[in-house]
C-alpha cells in the first residue's frame, strides 16, 4: 500500500529524476547500519533451502540485482537489505563519463518495461572503488560490471577493459565484462569470438576471481553460441543472459534509442537462455536475466539451468517487497516438486 503511493509520485516524475531521488535515499540509508537492519527485518527473507555455494562464493539466495541500478557502487548496503542474494554494481568505466544526452530513460507502463539509452554514465573506476570501500565488507557477493569508455576506439578496446579491470582488482567478488549494451556505439561489435578470447585470456592473467560475460539477446543463436564457447574456452566462469534488447517491436510506442528491459523481454530472454543452457549447462555457471518478475518465472529459469537470476525493471514496478515475495513463493514451488533445496532444482528440465 505504501509503495503504491510512493510509486504514484515517482511515476509522475521523469524516469531518470525519479531514479536519482531513490538513489539519494538509498545512499543515505547505506550510511546507517541501524536503518539497513530495520529494512531487512521488514523486507528481507532468509531460508536455508535457497542457499548455494557457487564458484567459491556463498549466495544466501539466487536472486540478484542487475547492473545499471547502482552504477557507482554507492548504495550497496541498503540494496542488500531488501533481500537480494547478491548485487552487481556498475557499469564502471576506466574514466568517468556523462553518458548520452537526456532524456535517456523511459517507462513503458502498460508493458511493465523500461527503455534506457544511458550510455554507461558513471563516476569512473577510481571513485567507484572509493564508494565500494566506504561500506565494505558486504554480507552478500558483489559483482563489478565493467564497460568500455565511449571515446575509446575499437582498436584500443582490449587495453581499455584491461585498464578498468586493473583499477577494480581489489573490490568485488566477481567481474562481468559488458560487451552487450546497445547504448555505446559499436560496443556490440566486440561480441565476436576473437575479441572475447583475447579479453578473457587477458583477464585470467590479472585475477583469480570469477569472470562473467554478459551477452545481448539480439545475437543470432549460432553467433551467440560461438561467442560463448570462445569465452568459456578462454577462461570465463559464467555467462549472464541477457542484456537489454533493441527489438522495438516488443512495445507499443518505443523511443528511437535505447535498449528495452522488463516484461516485454521475458519471452525473448527465456528463448535465448534455453538455447544457451542446452549447449553449456554443466560447462559454465549460467545466470538468467530479462523479464523475471515473479516466482513462477524465476523457478522456470532455474529448472532450465540458471544457477543465479537477476532482476531490475520488476524492482522498479513492484517495489521493495519484490524479493521477499519471489523468494517465499520460490520455496513453496521447490517444496511442491519435492526439491530439498534450490541447488537440486537447477537444470531439472535438462535431466
Swiss-Prot record:
One of its GO terms (cellular component) is plasma membrane. It is found in: Cell membrane. GO terms for molecular function: dihydroorotate dehydrogenase (quinone) activity. FMN binds at residues 67-71, 91, 145, 178, 214, 242, 262, 291, 312-313. Binds 1 FMN per subunit. The keyword Transmembrane does not apply. Substrate binds at residues 71, 116-120, 178, 183, 243-244. Its cofactor is FMN. InterPro entries: Aldolase_TIM (IPR013785), DHO_dehydrogenase (IPR050074), Dihydroorotate_DH_1_2 (IPR012135), Dihydroorotate_DH_2 (IPR005719), Dihydroorotate_DH_cat (IPR005720), Dihydroorotate_DH_CS (IPR001295). Pathway: Pyrimidine metabolism; UMP biosynthesis via de novo pathway; orotate from (S)-dihydroorotate (quinone route): step 1/1. It catalyses: (S)-dihydroorotate + a quinone = orotate + a quinol. It holds the Pfam family DHO_dh. It is a peripheral membrane protein. Its EC number is 1.3.5.2. Keywords: Cell membrane, Flavoprotein, FMN, Membrane, Oxidoreductase, Pyrimidine biosynthesis. The active site is at residue 181. Coiled coil: none annotated. One of its GO terms (biological process) is 'de novo' pyrimidine nucleobase biosynthetic process. Catalyzes the conversion of dihydroorotate to orotate with quinone as electron acceptor. HAMAP family: DHO_dh_type2. Belongs to the dihydroorotate dehydrogenase family. Type 2 subfamily. Monomer. This is Dihydroorotate dehydrogenase (quinone). The gene is pyrD.
